[in-house]
UniProtKB/Swiss-Prot annotation:
This is Urease subunit gamma. The gene is ureA. Pathway: Nitrogen metabolism; urea degradation; CO(2) and NH(3) from urea (urease route): step 1/1. One of its GO terms (molecular function) is nickel cation binding. The lineage of its organism: Bacteria, Pseudomonadati, Pseudomonadota, Gammaproteobacteria, Moraxellales. Belongs to the urease gamma subunit family. InterPro entries: Urease_gamma (IPR012010), Urease_gamma/gamma-beta_su (IPR002026), Urease_gamma_sf (IPR036463), Urease_subunit (IPR050069). It comes from Acinetobacter baylyi (strain ATCC 33305 / BD413 / ADP1). It comes from the Bacteria. Keywords: Cytoplasm, Hydrolase.
Length: 100
């Protein structure tokens, strides 16, 4: 399988997001990289499902709460940015204060 660098990045985000999703499902609190991966993967999947940038910006704030992450992690993540592919091209999706 031949993947370009962008496709490799998306594959890495998806894999890390899947690990984070499984850990969250087991009741574990997510650390910083897991929380960012969880949100990023969900945003990429949302774009694939046809959500708009505005919808994704709101959706990103609903995925995790402070009770889902280790102490201090919510304060460490001021924003999450991911370049998602939409029918009309790639766009940068930014979610400010994703963990409330």
């Amino acid at each position: 399988m031949e993947l370009n660098p962008t496709e490799k990045d998306k594959m890495l985000i998806f894999t890390a997001g899947l690990v984070a999703e499984r850990r969250k499902a087991r009741g574990l609190k997510l650390n910083y990289p897991e929380a960012v991966a969880f949100i990023s993967a969900a945003l990429l999947e949302g774009a694939r499902d046809g959500m708009s940038v505005a919808e994704l910006m709101h959706y990103g704030t609903t995925l995790l709460s402070k009770s889902d992450v280790m102490d201090g992690v919510a304060e460490m993540i001021a924003e999450v940015q991911v370049e998602a592919t939409f029918p009309d091209g790639s766009k940068l999706v930014t979610v400010h204060q994703p963990i409330v």
